[in-house]
Regions:
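Short, Lys/Arg-enriched anionic-surface-contact patches
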Residues: 2, 6-33
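Short basic/hydrophobic patches in alpha-helices and adjacent helix-turn junctions
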Residues: 38-43, 52, 68-71
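Short, basic interhelical loop/turn and adjoining N-cap
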Residues: 46-48, 52-65
Length: 105
């Protein structure tokens, strides 16, 4: 069973690598909020204060964060379909394809 602490630990690593504090006006806030809710729902936990973990500072950070989230999805394939739909929306909003991420990050 994945614990809330593990989810927070993984997300905190994302935060240090690519996320910044932000408000609900930040780019792709809805998708990021949904991703947290998806993980929490799947593992039976409630993630609170999601807004503190939501910001992406710039486009390069978006690419890095999506790459890291992809790695997390690979570890937990149970959430893959729904999470990939969210990532695709992030991808579209960033104006990039996954093939371009390697050169962008």
């Amino acid at each position: 069973m994945v614990t809330l602490e593990l989810i927070y630990g993984v997300m905190t690593d994302f935060y240090h690598q690519a996320f910044r504090l932000s408000t609900s006006r930040s780019p792709m806030f809805a998708e990021k909020k949904q991703m947290f809710a998806l993980l929490a729902r799947h593992y039976g936990h409630r993630v609170v204060d999601i807004r503190d973990y939501m910001g992406w500072r710039n486009h390069g950070s978006v690419c890095a964060a999506v790459r890291r989230m992809q790695g997390f999805i690979d570890v937990y394939p149970e959430v893959q379909r729904e999470a990939m739909e969210l990532l695709n929306r992030v991808d579209e909003a960033a104006g990039q394809t996954y093939l371009e991420f390697d050169s962008a990050v």
